[in-house]
């Protein structure tokens, strides 16, 4: 599980790579659920969705910050 404070220290490229990994993980969890109808760790899907939301929030913040710096400079 990621914390927003730790994510803000990463670069935009690292965040996007982590986002891609999390999306793949969620896809695999969805496929596992559909094939087995039972999961060993049902909470993992919820945590992954929340991690993706945190990642997208920090990515958006960084993009806006970069955009504001280019507009002011």
From Swiss-Prot:
GO molecular function: structural constituent of ribosome
GO annotations of cellular component type: ribonucleoprotein complex; ribosome
Region (Disordered): 1-20
Coiled coil start-end: none
Key words of the record: Ribonucleoprotein, Ribosomal protein
Highest taxon listed in the record's lineage: Bacteria
PROSITE patterns xref list: RIBOSOMAL_L29 (PS00579)
Gene Ontology biological process terms in this record: translation
Protein family: Belongs to the universal ribosomal protein uL29 family.
Name under which the protein is recorded: Large ribosomal subunit protein uL29
Originating organism: Protochlamydia amoebophila (strain UWE25)
Lineage: Bacteria, Pseudomonadati, Chlamydiota, Chlamydiia, Parachlamydiales
Gene from which the chain derives: rpmC
